[in-house]
C-alpha cells in the first residue's frame, strides 16, 4: 500500500472559463494523475509520488452538455437556435442527461484520486451532495436530496427544483 496518500485538495478558481478549455484542462490534470499512478507501479513504495487532487471552480459562457446516458431529444434547441442565443453544445463522457451552464452559475469540477480517500462511488456522490446542501444552508437556502435521484433539490418533492446537477466520470 502506498504510504504517500495525499488528502490535500488544491482549489483552482478559473473565473469565466469557456467549456472546451475547461474540458481540456480537466483532461490535462487527469492525465497527470494517471501518469504518476503509472510511474508508481514501477518503483518501490517508499519512492512513490503522491497523486494530486484538484477542485476547479468556474463559470461558463452559455453551454449545454449531454452526458452518456442522456437523450439528444432533451436538447430543445437546434444548431441555429443555439447560435442565436450564443450557446454551444457538447456531447461528453460523464453520466447524466442534458445540463445548462451559464454566467452566474458556479460550476465545480473535482479531479480527485479517490484512492487517496475511499473508492465507493456512491459514498462519493452522497458526500458531494452533502457539501452542496451545507453550502446552501450557509446562504439560507434549505436544500436536500430526493430518494432515488442524484443531485440536490429545493422545495417539496412534488414541486422540487434542482439546485445542483451532478454528473461524474470515474476511471
Predicted region positions:
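N-terminal lobe of the biotin/lipoate ligase/transferase fold
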Residues: 1-160
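Catalytic cores of processing enzymes, dominated by hydrolases/peptidases
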Residues: 161-171
Amino acid at each position: 500500500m502506498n504510504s504517500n496518500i495525499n488528502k490535500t485538495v488544491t482549489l483552482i478558481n478559473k473565473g469565466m472559463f469557456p467549456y472546451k478549455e475547461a474540458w481540456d484542462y480537466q483532461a490535462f490534470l487527469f492525465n497527470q494523475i494517471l501518469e504518476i499512478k503509472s510511474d508508481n507501479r514501477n518503483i518501490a513504495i517508499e519512492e512513490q509520488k503522491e497523486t494530486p487532487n484538484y477542485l476547479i471552480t468556474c463559470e461558463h459562457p452559455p453551454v449545454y452538455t449531454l452526458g452518456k446516458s442522456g437523450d439528444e431529444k432533451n436538447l430543445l434547441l437546434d444548431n441555429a437556435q443555439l447560435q442565436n442565443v450564443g450557446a454551444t453544445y457538447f456531447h461528453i463522457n460523464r453520466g447524466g442527461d442534458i445540463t445548462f451552464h451559464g454566467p452566474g452559475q458556479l460550476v465545480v469540477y473535482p479531479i480527485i484520486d479517490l484512492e487517496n480517500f475511499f473508492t465507493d462511488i456512491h459514498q462519493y456522490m452522497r458526500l458531494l451532495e452533502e457539501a452542496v446542501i451545507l453550502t446552501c444552508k450557509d446562504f439560507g437556502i434549505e436544500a436536500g436530496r430526493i430518494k432515488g435521484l442524484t443531485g440536490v433539490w429545493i422545495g417539496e418533492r412534488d414541486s422540487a427544483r434542482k439546485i445542483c446537477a451532478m454528473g461524474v466520470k470515474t476511471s
